[in-house]
UniProtKB/Swiss-Prot annotation:
GO terms for cellular component: mitochondrial intermembrane space. The twin Cx9C motifs are involved in the recognition by the mitochondrial disulfide relay system. Belongs to the CMC4 family. Residues 2-44 form the CHCH domain. This is Cx9C motif-containing protein 4, mitochondrial. A motif (Cx9C motif 2) lies at residues 26-36. A motif (Cx9C motif 1) lies at residues 5-15. Keywords: Disulfide bond, Mitochondrion, Repeat. The lineage of its organism: Eukaryota, Fungi, Dikarya, Ascomycota, Saccharomycotina. The keyword Disulfide bond applies. Disulfide bonds join 5-36, 15-26. The keyword Disulfide bond applies.
Length: 77
């Protein structure tokens, strides 16, 4: 099985590398991954697994947290 969310996960890794691991600058890509993962579980069910997505219960928690405001770590200089 190919991982449908691998491009989003790889984009996060590239962004983190490019920005010196400043997670706050990659927030839009993290959101994109979580959207992809939500679609993945909606289409394939909660028992589906992929290495690029958190398990459904953790994904729900992450989405709830992100809905409350910015949570990404900012790099301390």
């Amino acid at each position: 099985m190919t991982d449908p969310c691998k491009p989003q996960a790889c984009a996060i890794q590239g962004c983190l590398t490019k920005t010196g691991f400043d997670e706050s600058k990659c927030s839009h890509l993290i959101d994109s991954l979580y959207e992809c993962c939500s679609k993945f579980y909606n289409e394939r069910g909660a028992d589906a697994r992929t290495p690029c997505c958190p398990v459904p219960s953790l994904l729900r928690l992450k989405l709830e947290q992100r809905a409350c405001g910015p949570l990404d770590a900012k790099r301390v200089r």
